[in-house]
Amino acid sequence: MKSLKAYAIAAHFGPTMLITTISFLLAARLWWEGPAYLIAFTVFLGQLLIGWSNDIYDYQDDLKHNRVNKPLVSGQLQIEDLKKATFILLPIALLANLLGPLGLKGGAVYLLGVGCGIAYNFYFKFRITSPLVYFIALAALPASIFYAVDRNPPLWVLATSSLLGVAFHFANVLKDLSADRDSNIGGLPQRLGRRASLVIIAILLVIVLTILLNSPISSTFTSRVI
């Protein structure tokens, strides 16, 4: 049981379950609960890949900053075991998303989002373009589920999802700004600093709220599956 908990923590369990829950609720709304559970599970597998690859890549930096809340640093989990689990999971996640209820199109779109998450871990968190992968990945999630039910995702859904993703990126970085700079992590929030990041978060949330207040939410999130 302790080992399972360590794997869950290494997957960044909070954000992973948040994305998984959102996917279930959206799928249940657009389809029905049966495939929604399967979609949530396949989404969960993709999020595991993002979380685990992040902790694998950050291992040396986490050791440097003595982040004992990380299972790899505390010794609850060995890095070779996490690498092995990640490589085993990779083909399973690919097949589950492409051959599952998301379908080839929906699965490919969702996997694009997963790829963005992994690309952030290894490359984009050091670049000024760091918000770009959040923008794409968070749009890919709802888009994949709309495609699964043969519907085109409305632009307002893509816009709000993308902007919320970018806002989350800025908010998520705030607590680690000084440590990130010490580790030469130079994403856009780290370059702009706390005050500018807070302003950007506020602006993005106002834009999202404005879009939502002027969008046909109830009619959009209605199942058309007979």
How would you describe each model-predicted region?
Residues 1-226:
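Multi-pass alpha-helical membrane architecture of UbiA-family
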